[in-house]
């Protein structure tokens, strides 16, 4: 995959100064976890397992956490959406003031972030192994931070993260090959499944908001032969959607009318 135009993700430590006299750690943790949730739904941080701990910085007591961010400046206030700011204001009422953050290190295990946040086209794509935005550039396949396009649509951004969680859960089940394998596979590979319908709706809403053609990735596995796979038509309109050459070793099919992309069955790749 060509990731020449991308930048690494970062391990970052935000710090909240504690100015309250009484120390209700349970309540303070809940308020900070609410900020973590909203940062995540806005795409400012990646992943769900966030350590939160008491610490001291420059002689001041407070809380810190370790988060993965797609960019060095992801946590700057200008990237906040309305719901992040509300969670911050709520925490401030209880004496928790966001003081800033320090960059600890580059995260060498993370997926890289797109440098161009407004490509010629983009797609909704994820896998059970990915820890990044589900919005991928059609220019170089790298993930685009959600706040770059959806900061003014918090509900849409959150809905997209929920869709990603569901897609990854189904992918994990079908890859494990045990409980609910068949049902999970049909959710990510059938055009009329609940998950695919949700994803197509989200892609259309994102295109409306961003003005960028936004496609939905339909997973493909099985099939009879490589030859029959290559002759596959668009499952929505029945049209020819085969690309002259595959993109990023993944995308072999692209229907501009239906805003769909797909792979040749993984059985033959």
Language-model segments: residues:
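A composition-driven signal for long, intrinsically disordered, charge-rich low-complexity tracts
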Residues: 51, 144-147, 188-190, 217-230
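Domain-scale terminal segments
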Residues: 4-185, 212
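Cys/His-clustered metal-coordination modules, chiefly Zn-binding fingers
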Residues: 197, 201-269
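A short, highly charged nucleic-acid-interacting micro-segment common to nuclease
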Residues: 184-197
């Amino acid at each position: 995959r060509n990731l020449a135009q991308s930048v690494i993700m970062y391990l970052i430590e935000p710090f909240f100064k504690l100015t309250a006299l009484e120390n209700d750690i349970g309540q303070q943790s809940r308020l900070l976890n609410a900020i973590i949730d909203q940062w995540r739904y806005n795409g400012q941080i990646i992943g769900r397992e966030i350590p939160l701990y008491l610490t001291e910085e420059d002689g001041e007591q407070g809380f810190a956490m370790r988060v993965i961010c797609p960019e060095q400046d992801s946590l700057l206030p200008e990237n906040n959406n309305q719901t992040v700011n509300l969670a911050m204001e709520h925490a401030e009422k209880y004496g928790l003031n966001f003081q800033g953050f320090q960059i600890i290190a580059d995260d060498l295990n993370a997926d890289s972030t797109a440098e161009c946040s407004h490509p010629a086209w983009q797609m909704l794509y994820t896998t059970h192994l990915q820890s990044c935005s589900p919005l991928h550039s059609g220019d170089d396949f790298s993930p685009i931070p959600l706040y770059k396009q959806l900061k003014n649509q918090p509900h849409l951004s959150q809905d997209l993260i929920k869709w990603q969680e569901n897609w990854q859960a189904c992918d994990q089940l079908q890859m494990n090959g045990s409980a609910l394998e068949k049902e999970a596979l049909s959710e990510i590979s059938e055009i009329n499944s609940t998950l695919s319908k949700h994803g197509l709706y989200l892609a259309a809403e994102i295109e409306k908001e961003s003005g960028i053609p936004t496609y939905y990735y339909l997973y493909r596995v099985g099939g009879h032969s490589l030859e029959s796979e290559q002759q596959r038509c668009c499952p929505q309109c029945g049209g020819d959607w085969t690309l002259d050459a595959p993109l990023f070793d993944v995308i072999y099919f692209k229907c501009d009318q239906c805003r769909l992309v797909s792979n040749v069955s993984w059985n033959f790749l």
